[in-house]
A protein has these predicted regions:
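A structural microfeature
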Residues: 11-13, 131-134, 176, 198, ...
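Extended acidic/polar, glycine-enriched regions
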Residues: 31-35, 101-188
């Protein structure tokens, strides 16, 4: 996918890719006091130099402008980016430090150094009054740290969110204001599993595509949030993998609100392209991390192309970029082969070993190349036993039992952090895949989100 943006017939910028947001400064090209025509030209063809394309992929990407587009009005000097993270003392004490990495931009004509005041306030979401936690005089980008007493932690059962208000002031005037939703929590994968706020949690999740019948990707905020509601409240999982690309901010925001953990990853499926392609994939890592790193639900960055082979130089770079932009989260990389080169923090593996009669999963030691590192199963079942919602009952029961068997086996393996079943619902695909009708019947629900018997397992 490629987008070219024109203002009054003049190209002012563009973007490659279809899964993360982008912005273009058009202020210097505007006709002040006159009508302006803003045009976006979208090329939705499968460009071989842009991930996930380059070879066949097992899902449809559709096309068009399927998420929001808007004009953002700003002062010449504004808050360009705010990255929030926290330090929480061990023992889950109620006091924490809020760390803010703030980027200030000046789109004006002067390079004159100016001094600004950054002021931060916080309130628990749903309450009325903000409390100021600190302020600091700055002349440029700044990393600030302010104490926040008596915080409530974000967790699965009580996902407390705070609104952090950051104000940029000069001579007592507010130039810009940003309100960011944030959750205080610790999340870490260790050798023996995943820990949230110091407590071990076995991840029990499903993979989700963002497609719908008839409309492809083009569903509004309400439907994105509804999928998160289905995962948490109807299916009963505690985690979701956004296969195989970053998904709508509305979906992830709802995961924040529900206490649903998210493993998100860059676009791709098995294929690694040339140097131009790889450069775009690295840009995809940058965009993904910068746009989703304030979400407490996000616990793992997927920095490998799903089920691709080893490419150490390439994946050293994707891993480096993710850690540089967000040192607070670990990285993973989904592979379909054992004893792979492990450059990330977590060995994530698609385990399709279960055939309905054998043990539900492989031992960690049989798969990972470093048994001292965390291990996570990123896919299972799916194409091993395609099942329609109207298949005969015995077939649907066996489909459900395959999910039971894997979940039971993973629960018995103390050193496996958890697993993500393939997948939440059936989806459209290319002609090379599916059941001859361009549909993959791999879900525990059909594509209309009606449950099959396997949905009850979760």
């Amino acid at each position: 996918w490629e987008a070219d943006v024109y203002l009054n017939g003049i190209r002012v910028g563009g973007y490659k890719g279809g899964y993360t947001a982008f912005s273009i400064d058009i202020s210097k090209k505007l006709r002040i006091g006159a009508e302006n025509v803003l045009t976006v030209r979208v090329d939705s063809r499968e460009n071989l130099n842009i991930p996930p394309f380059g070879y066949v992929i097992d899902y449809m990407t559709y096309g068009g402008i399927y998420r929001e587009a808007y004009v953002d009005l700003k002062n010449e000097t504004y808050l360009a980016d705010i990255f929030l993270h926290s330090e929480i003392p061990e023992g889950q004490k109620p006091d924490a430090k809020l760390i803010s990495e703030i980027e200030i931009k000046n789109s004006g004509k002067t390079d004159e150094k100016k001094e600004f005041l950054i002021r931060q306030s916080i309130r628990e979401r749903g309450t009325e009054n903000y409390r100021q936690i600190g302020e600091s005089r700055v002349a440029s980008d700044r990393k600030l740290s302010f104490p926040v007493p008596d915080v409530k932690l974000w967790d699965l059962e009580n996902p407390v969110l705070y609104e952090v208000k950051t104000e940029l002031l000069q001579n007592g005037n507010v130039l810009d204001e940003n309100i960011t939703l944030f959750g205080f929590r610790t999340a870490v994968f260790l050798q023996d599993g995943f820990y949230l706020n110091g407590k071990k949690v076995k991840l029990r999740g499903l993979n989700r595509h963002q497609s719908y019948p008839y409309v492809g990707y083009a569903m509004p905020e309400s439907m994105q949030k509804r999928d998160a509601d289905i995962l948490k409240n109807e299916l009963g999982v505690n985690a979701v993998r956004t296969s195989h690309y970053p998904q709508s901010r509305h979906f992830v925001e709802r995961c924040d609100e529900l206490g649903l953990l998210v493993f998100t990853e860059i676009p791709g499926w098995q294929h690694i392209g040339d140097e131009i392609w790889k450069k775009q994939a690295v840009e995809n890592v940058k965009d993904m991390v910068e746009q989703y790193r304030n979400h407490p639900s996000v616990i793992l960055w997927g920095v490998r192309i799903n089920e691709s082979g080893d490419d150490d130089a390439f994946y050293q770079e994707t891993n480096r970029v993710a850690h540089e932009l967000d040192p607070t989260r670990q990285t993973g990389g989904v592979r379909a082969h054992k004893k792979s080169s492990l450059l990330e923090d977590v060995y994530t593996y698609n385990d399709f070993s279960h055939n309905g009669t054998n043990h539900g999963c492989e031992k960690k030691s049989a798969v990972t190349s470093d048994n001292s590192k965390p291990y996570l199963i990123s896919e299972y079942n799916g194409h091993m036993y395609p099942t329609k919602s109207y298949d005969w009952e015995e077939h649907r029961v066996w489909h459900a039992m395959r999910h039971v068997n894997v979940l039971d086996a993973v629960a018995g393996e103390a050193d496996i952090a958890g697993s993500f079943g393939w997948c939440m619902f059936d989806y459209n695909t290319h002609k090379d895949f599916g059941s001859g009708d361009r549909i993959c019947y791999h879900g525990v629900m059909d594509m209309f989100r009606n449950p099959k018997l396997a949905a009850a397992v979760y």
